[in-house]
Amino acid sequence: LSPPPPPLAAEIRRLGEAAVAAGWRLACLRPAVGGERLELAEAGPAPAYDPAAVAPARDPAAGELGLAVDLGTTGLAWRLLSLADGRTVAEGRGVNPQLGAGGEVVSRLAFALTPGGGELLRRLVLDVLVRLAALAGRKPSALCLAGNSAMMAIVCDKPLAGLAHAPYGLSWRGGETVALGRGLPPAYVPPLLGPFVGADVSAGLTALVAQNPAYPFLLADLGTNAEMVLALAPGRYLAASAPLGPALEGVGLTDGAMAGPGVAVDFELTPAGLAPVLFGGPEATGPPRGIAGPGYLRLAAILREQGVLDADGRFAQNPAPTPLGRRLQARVARQGGEAVFDAAGCRLFASDVEELLKVKAACNLAMAGLLGAAGLATSALAAVYLAGAFGANVSAEALETLGFFPPGLAGRSHVAGNLSLAGAALFLTEPARRATAEALPGQTAIVPLVAPQAGVAGGGDPFISRMVFSYVP
């Protein structure tokens, strides 16, 4: 192995002195120069398709098959389904193979704009699509790809300049069938509503509208970006997007992990204290191997409720107001000069809390911007639909406690599942639904979050002012 370089302060703080002395370093802080011989740590738990679930895809009784794909910045979800009756014959999820090129859209686009970078990223996704298509044992007859505007432009080999830097705009708007090559069927890409409101939103909104929801409602898909649509009436929509980074996907936090076996997706208070709830339900046992984004939010909400965290995100210096809070407070220590909470064997550092505050501020900004642009009171909302893998696991009460959403919305929040994937599947089994999606660009106004309605009374930075664990209108 190559000799380790001198440790950085951040590596000592995060890894501990023993690990640093043993030669471990953080790859995310070390630019590769070539020629190094390295030992890689065991990869954290990442979701992948269950081979047992794939077997039915080879059932000839399913008839012609379609492949629906939701390509996110961090994750990739897919479904093979019968075009005859719409039934699912296989499905799964995993990581976007481009993740090594950057955990959020900006760095991904920057890599794609380097010589050969875009072609490499495109090839990585096409390799996955080819493998998924092969699971059927025969070529799928149809393919639909949904995802944010950047992911769609990269995989479809479209111009990226208007997505990567100002002035932002769309040079390609989707809503058409694209030839991907590699023996894949032509892919239908739903329309892009804006440079930061993509085909995943148009697909998800179409799937939700097909269920005849009551208006007005809010559709929120929180992942690497916060993509929100405020539906005022049929055919009248406001949309906004805010970059969140990969923290809610479990990426970039000290003990973060994508939801999967052995990963804590929730926490609960028991007579014995704080207990993690692992992915997979009550039958999943053992110490957590990491914490997913929803688990981090629930943990922070509990600590906030018990007075262990202050509203500004700092670990409280004053004694917590309840005996339980003081018991939890006793688990706060210092490591590498930073406050850290021991969460059932996992750690919540002060710097992790800061990352959650940044995510909260961006989400709060999008919510306030939409409601302000519509002149709509929170009480007027009929429902909030939480979409995506994150929405399937997150506690609406935690979102309200931490100020992501205004008070009173938790009781009107509903888990909607992966609506982007549902919409992609709908476009395959009911092609007439594509017309509904293709009308959305003309029915949707994009709300810029730097507009005056996104600010706060008295001026100040609208993002910084929302870096508190309470909702700021």
How would you label these PLM feature ranges?
Residues K139-N148, A300, T378-G388:
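Short glycine-rich phosphate-binding loop at a beta-alpha junction
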Residues A48-E64, L184-F217, L371:
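Conserved phosphate-binding catalytic cores of ATP/NTP-utilizing and phosphoryl-transfer enzymes
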Residues W24, E39, A43-D50, Y188-S202, ...:
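Acidic, glycine/GT-rich loop-and beta-edge segments that sit at the periphery of enzyme/chaperone cores
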Residues W78, G86-E104, A161-T177, A203, ...:
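Glycine-rich phosphate-binding loop of actin/hexokinase-like ATP-binding domains
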Residues A368, G372, L376-P441:
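Catalytic phosphate/nucleotide-handling subdomain of diverse soluble enzymes
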Residues P5-V69, L76:
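Fe-S ferredoxin-like electron-transfer domains
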Residues P97-L135, P261-F267, E355-K358, A362-L365:
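N-terminal phosphate-binding loop and adjacent alpha-helix
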Residues R304-A374:
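A contiguous, well-structured pocket-lining segment that forms one wall/lid of small-molecule binding clefts
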